């Protein structure tokens, strides 16, 4: 075999490896969350954010609570007095999901974002995974807020 042919085969192999990895990368998507959740409770006041989903024994499968802070920064949630296992997605000011965590009922440990977040969406534990909603996807937050008025 000629050296030129071997170089061609080597480049072709690298190209196919590259295509394989690129095709397996998660493509982020823009999500209209109202297509997934029939009820989204919006909490923007301090007292409402502080209480969150405390004391509720159950929440519907297609229910979410959207927390809105007056500033973008590192935000924290906890599960004190919360009966239902939850997942939380921290969302930046542009609507991009930056982190997703599963939270344990009654835990007093804070679950904090490591990046600046403006919003958080709490849902039943495992819901994001079930819906194939991932870090990097974007939620149309402004659309939710416009429909809430």
Residue spans of the language-model regions?
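Compact, glycine-rich, soluble single-domain proteins
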Residues: 28-149
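Sec-dependent signal peptide recognition
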Residues: 7-18
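Hydrophobic h-region of N-terminal signal peptides that target proteins for export
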Residues: 17-27
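Intrinsically disordered, low-complexity cationic segments
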Residues: 3-4, 14, 25
